[in-house]
Regions:
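A structural signal for well-ordered alpha-helices, especially hydrophobic packing surfaces
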Residues: 23, 27, 46-50, 79, ...
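Short acidic DE-rich linear segments
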Residues: 2-5, 83-87
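Intrinsic disorder/low-complexity segments
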Residues: 6-7, 12, 44-47, 59, ...
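N-terminal acidic leader/helix
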Residues: 2-39
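Acidic, low-complexity, intrinsically disordered interaction modules
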Residues: 31-72
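Long amphipathic alpha-helices with heptad-repeat character
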Residues: 16, 68, 72-75, 79
Length: 87
């Protein structure tokens, strides 16, 4: 597993599981309140997750996973990056 910095594999796998599941629900949800709840859950998780992993996923972008207007794009990017880190 090539994850760059010394990020524990379980942190990558756990984050992938959460983000992948939330992305699938968010992508197909037609409920604005459900989508808002998902944004809140993911942002809260991101604030407490492994800081090195967050930095790698954010790739220097301020407000990564925290802004409503870019949330879907950010979450897709995070899931894609996590998938590549696990292979």
């Amino acid at each position: 597993m090539d994850n760059g910095a010394a990020i524990p594999p379980d942190a990558i796998e756990w984050t992938y599981c959460i983000f992948h599941q939330k992305l699938r629900v968010y992508k197909f949800s037609t409920s604005p309140s459900q989508r808002d709840e998902i944004e809140h859950v993911v942002a809260s998780y991101a604030m407490d997750m492994n800081p090195d992993l967050y930095k790698k996923l954010a790739d220097g972008r301020e407000g990564f996973l925290m802004e409503h207007t870019r949330f879907f794009e950010d979450l897709e990017h995070a899931v894609d990056t996590l998938e590549s880190m696990m292979s």
